């Protein structure tokens, strides 16, 4: 039984069931990101090399996020690290980005969007401390 939120992504009529990250999966994801960045060269890179590294890191981060999410399914026996290579091979960049965004939203990893209406209401509200 899982208490995690879930949602479905429907690329080309297929259903991909994505889950909120558990506390354990979130820790695994953070550890993965830290280790990925430790191995990066820091000096003497050209702008093109920096762009390539940033692109590769983004895709790897997104793939791990999706893999960890998929590993949360009750019927999934593999860990996220085992699913990761499959995600890297089978997901095109656009689908990978969409899936990763959905996982971030399910997991509360995306800051809430403040609409213009909400900002106006907050500005117009009386300041109780000044009263």
Give the residues covered by each predicted segment.
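Short, surface-exposed, charged amphipathic helix/loop patches that serve as local interaction elements
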Residues: 2-4, 17-131
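Short acidic-hydrophobic surface loop/beta-edge motif
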Residues: 4-13
